[in-house]
Amino acid sequence: MRDRRAPEAWFRDRAALALIGRRYLPWLAALSLGWEIVQLPLYTIWDHPNAGYIAYAVLHCTVGDVLIGLASLLAALLATRAGTIEQWNHAAVTCVLIGVGVGYTAYSEWTNTVLRASWTYSVLMPTIRITGVELGLSPLLQWIVVPPVALWLARRSHRQPEVT
C-alpha cells in the first residue's frame, strides 16, 4: 500500500503523461525532423541520386530521434525521482535528458561511422575528437538543443485543468 504522504510518481500523473505524449513527443518529432533536414548536407547521403532513399533516411532518423528522446526523458524522470509536473526539478531533468541523449548519440555515431561504416560525414561536417574518435558536432549539438527545447515548449504549452 502506498503512503498517502509520499509524492505522486510521474508515471501515475495524468498531466505528466499527457505532457509527454501530447506535447513533448510532437514537439520533439517536429524539431528533430527539421534538424535532420537541415543537417543533411553534413552527411554524404546528401549526394545520393535517389530522393526516395534520402527521404526514407530522414524519416528513419527522425523516428529514431523520437525514440531516443523519449527514452532519455524517461531515464531523466526516473533518475531524478520525479513526481507530478509541479514537483519536477526541471534543471535536473534537463541535465539528465541531455546527458543520456549526448551519450547515446556519441556511441551511435562511433558505431555507425567507425565500426559499421553505415554512414559517413561530408567535408562540411564539423567534427570533434573525443578519446581518439572523430564525432560529428551536429548530431551531438542536436541532443543539447532539441530535446530541452521540445520539453520547454511542451511545458510552456501545457495548461493545467481549471478547478471548478
Where are these regions (language model features)?
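Aromatic-rich, lipid-facing transmembrane alpha helices and their immediate juxtamembrane interface loops
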Residues: 1-164
